Design a protein with these regions (language model features):
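Conserved, mostly hydrophobic/aromatic
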Residues: 47, 113, 160
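Anionic-ligand binding region
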Residues: 135, 150-167
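Glycine-rich, proline-tolerant flexible connector loops at the mouths of alpha/beta enzymes
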Residues: 45-72
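Active-site-adjacent beta->alpha loops and helix N-cap segments on the catalytic face
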Residues: 2-3, 55-57, 74-79, 103-104, ...
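Catalytic beta/alpha-barrel core
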Residues: 119-130, 144-152
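N-terminal amphipathic alpha-helix/helix-capping segment at the start of soluble metabolic enzymes
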Residues: 1-16
Length: 184
């Protein structure tokens, strides 16, 4: 298990905010990471934009579109993390989709993430049964592959929790909101 993630949960529950990298810009994202840390974030999720974020609601989908339209790439996100790590040791995990990792090259993506100081990786579109392809590379480089648990059977929850690293991302609902709501 990653040391910084373990330390983030030493006091029990952790405050874990999320931000889509590059919305509205990578410079603003960097400053928001510092602000979140200053506000008490125990760990920060950095979303690497993807063109088809199927596990997200409309607000984060639009943030992904804006970031990609603004020219955000995986390499530019990595460069931003390098800058952040010069000023911050707050635990950070990437949240992105398997295709982002595949297209970059799984080994190259995870190795680079580790080298720049990332602590974990969340891939919401990778089922528990298919995580091994990523898990072995993550373990090799000291990155926690964060497991997701959606509403499911008690047996499946127990199995996923038993094998989890870092922390468990609990999905509270399988519903996606496809139209804007007042909560946007």
């Amino acid at each position: 298990m990653n040391k910084r993630i373990t330390e983030a949960f030493e006091k029990g529950k952790a405050f874990i905010p999320f931000i889509t990298c590059g919305d509205p810009s990578l410079e603003v994202t960097e400053q928001l990471v510092y602000a979140m840390e200053e506000a008490g974030a125990d760990l920060i999720e950095l979303g690497i934009p993807f063109s088809d974020p199927t596990a997200e609601g409309p607000v984060i989908q639009r943030a992904n579109v804006r970031a990609l339209s603004g020219g955000v790439t995986t390499d530019k996100v990595f460069d931003m993390v390098v800058k952040i790590r010069k000023n911050s040791s707050v635990p950070m995990v990437f949240m992105t989709y398997a295709n982002v990792v595949f297209s970059y090259g799984t080994e190259r993506f995870i190795k680079t993430a580790a080298e720049i100081g990332m602590d974990g990786l969340i891939l919401p579109d990778v089922p528990f049964e298919e995580k091994e392809e990523f898990d072995s590379v993550c373990k090799k480089h000291g990155i926690d592959l964060i497991s997701l648990i959606a509403p499911t059977s008690h047996e499946r929850v127990a199995q996923i929790a038993k094998d989890a690293e870092g922390f468990v991302y609990c999905v509270s609902s399988c519903l996606l909101y496809t139209s804007p709501s007042p909560r946007d």
